[in-house]
Each structure stands twice: as C-alpha cells, then as structure tokens.
Amino acid sequence: MAINQAHVHPHYTLPGVMHYLQTEFTKNERDRITWELERSEMKARIAELEGENRDLKHQLNQIQSKAVSPEGEKEEKHVPDSLLQSKLAVQENVKEIIYLLKGPNTVNQLESLNSREAGSELHDLEKLNVNTPKEEGSAKTNGMDILNNALLDTKPNPKQGPSESPSPTKVKSLFSTANKRENNETISKIHSELSKVDIISSYGDCMALYDADTKSLEIHQVDANLNSKLLKKISLGQDSDIMKFFWVSTSKLLVIEKSFHLKLFSISSASLISDVDLLQDSEQPFSSSDIINIDFKNKWLLIASKNKSQIRIWELDNIEAPEDVPINIKETYEITHDNDDDDSNDSTNILDCILGITEKSLILLSSNPYQLTIYDFEGKLLQKIDLKIDTILSGKPEEEGYHLFLDRKTSKLLIQLSNERLLVYSFDKKKVVLKEQLTPSSTLPIQLDLNDSIITVSYSNGDFEFRNLENLKPSIDEFVVADINFSERKEPVVFSSNLIVDSTPVLITVNKNNEVLLHKIKI
C-alpha cells in the first residue's frame, strides 16, 4: 500500500526575501567595486610606466644629441629641463587618475554601501575589506598607495632653474603690513632695466618681466633670500604685440601675439625657435578685441572668443621636446557654444573658458543663466552645472571680473563673478561647496590669482589680501604696497603670485618707480 508522503513547501517571508536580495546585491556591488579598484590600479601603474618611459626617452635623446654635437658640455644643461618635463607630465597623469578614483564609479558607490552621510569624506576603503593583501602572501598594492608614491617621486623641485649662482640685490621694506610685521627678510626690491613692466609671469623660481613699449623681455631667477639674478634679456622685435605668454619649461617661452602668431623662444640663446600662424587654415579668423581668455597646458593651446561664442584648441607638436626644435600644429578643434536647450530668446554670453581637469576637456562659464558647461574637444556636451545665482550682480556680463581658476591638486574650481562674489565648485562632491561675498566698494577693479590653494586678491588701490581655497577666509597676511598710489588709476595692478621660492609662494608686483617688489606669502 502506497503511503502518501506530505510535500514540504519552503516558507518565504517578506523580511527574509528582502534580506536575501540585499545580501546578494551587496555581494555583487563589492565584486564590482573590487573590479573598478583593480582597473584604477592598472591605470595608475600604466601612468607610472608611461612616465618612466617618457623619462627614458628624454635621457636617450640627450645622449644621442650629445654624441653628435661638437659642444657636448653645453648640451648637459638641458638634461635637468628634460627630466623636469617628464616629471611634470607624470604628475599631471597621476592627478588625473586621482580624480578618476574619486569619481562616481568607485568612491560614490562605497559611500552608498556604507550608508554614509553626503558631506563626509570619501576616502575610507577599509570597511569593505577589498583591495587588501591576501593571507597567502599576495603582493597586491593599493591603488592610492601607488598614486601617493608617484606624487612623492615626481614632485618638481622649485629651486631647479637655469642657474645656481644668483647675485645679491638691494633689499629694504616696501610693504606696510596690516599686522605690522617687522621681518624684512620676506620683502625685497629688484631693479629692472625695463622702462616699465606690463606683464609678469613666473615658473618655479624664475620670473619674466615684459615691457610693451620696448618689446623687451627680462628673465630673472630668485633665491631663498629673495635675491635676484638677471639671466637673460630678449628682444621680441618691434612688430611684436603680445597678448599673453606661457612658460613651456625653464628654457622656453611660448608667446601669443595679437596677430595670432605663435612664437617659441629659447631663453638660453635668447633667440626665436619657431613662428606659426594659428589662423593660416581658418575660414573664420578671430579678432583680438573679441578674445575672452587664452589658456595653455602641456601641448594644448585654447583661445575663447565672444564672436559667435567660439572656442578653438590647437594640439602643438614638438612642444615638449627638450631640444630647441620648431613646433607645428598637429590638430585643430573648433567648438561653438550655444544655448539651444533654453526656451527663451535671450542669448548666452561666454564669460571665461579654460582647459578642463581631464585630458581633452574644457570648462566654460556663461551667463543667462550663470552656469558651467563642460565639453570635450569634439564639441560633445559632457555636463552642465547651474550655479543657482539668485541675486542680481553689480557687474554686467560683458564687463571684466568673471574668471575661472582650476586647482587640479584638490579638484576644485574657483569662480569669480562680477568682481564681488567667489564660488568654489568641487568636482569630487559635484556641487558648489563655498560661497563668499567680497566688498570692493571704491577699490574696483579686483583681480585674483590662484597658486597651490592660495588665493591672492589684488585691489586697484594697492591693497593685497590672501585667502585659502579650503574656506575662502582671509589670512592675517594682509598688506598695502608702499611707495605706490593707485587711487587715481583704473587699470588693473600688474602682479603674479606663481613664483615659488624655497617651497614658498611669492607675490610679485611693481610700484610707481618701476621697482619690482617681492613678498613671501605667509598663510
């Protein structure tokens, strides 16, 4: 006789099913994040190897050049420049990978898995127990460790320059500081042979001074005691009319003229290396009066124009070569910014445009409404960021006072709006993290400069103040330039804060007697 056996059915409950699904989801997410981290580690390792490869190529080029050159001893001075170039290139790659590691594919997912608050720091990976060495003795390395070691190994030496034997100059106090500091070692005066100084630019411990009347350029090197030595004086030619110039290395300068000729000068020989017409193949030429900004990074040159809201980027070939070889244009990109997404008939204005935080990208600040737009070099829209400006700004969009400053080390963007408002946008947190209102009153115009997370604020009456990018709060190192009177001047103050001496940023400005003033910035 058959015995009826009772069938046992599984008993499911809603909490049990939810627990099972959550467990499986967490497991899958951990596996996926582990794969993302491994991929990021590989990117970091690739960047490190590419940097080593680039370094070896530079050294090989130098050895080959010295072998065929009858003046081998003179060629040796280019070796530090080539090494510095490769180190800076590796550092840029590493910074970009750090930014990618902080992106939504990895760190934001870690945040959601660990149920963290939105404003917390996003760098703790230990809670998931991923990417750690195995008990069997695996030698797997954490990706951030690779990046940190690479940054330490590739940190450029600010003291490195064309010469190591500066000559002393006369030093005396030229600043009356707000806190009445008596340390005169942080202040220096340098005599220049130029009749006046119109442009100041710096690179490491070297600075370039330009006189637009005589078309002359002076290159100085500054030591830890703020003593200066004149390294070279270069005549750019009477037909030269400079809009902007950039340092390529301690031995080369890139000059952009109003005729849109791009000239590369050798500092060591004080000679012209190459002259390229940027618009030789262009059907729509630029006008220098329409130029909003010119930016340069690595081998990319960007020029933004108000005319039809156009941006052009040139890829320069041979620009990173350690030898004095002519440059040429490898490729040109054209991007037209429009406001087609808006239903209104109001036109959008480009206020500023700079090269982006990642390779082949740019960041654009526009009005109506005030927003950031990120494009790639093919013109593809990557992101739009509404700045949510809900108050009326005093300055008009077509006026000066709208600028972007990118700090790649912290992945933050400093935004200046109409001489009166500062914003800080974080690419890590994908939002505006700081806002600060300036009170310029009668001291317009205001100029900004950003160097190593230190914001230099210049007022047209000769006042300078310094703020930290982390909180936008002014430091105690405020001062007024003595022997100077800008009360009746309306043009901007000529200054630069990118000079680095003994790992310390230095402010450079000029007084009414055409004396170049140096001031060590204390934060």
Swiss-Prot record:
Residues 26-76 form a coiled coil. Residues 61-80, 150-171 are annotated as: Disordered. One of its GO terms (cellular component) is FAR/SIN/STRIPAK complex. It is found in: Cytoplasm; Endoplasmic reticulum. The modification Phosphoserine is found at residue 115. It comes from the Eukaryota. Residues 160-171 have a biased composition (Polar residues). It holds the Pfam family Striatin. The keyword Coiled coil applies. Residues 71-80 have a biased composition (Basic and acidic residues). This is Factor arrest protein 8. The gene is FAR8.
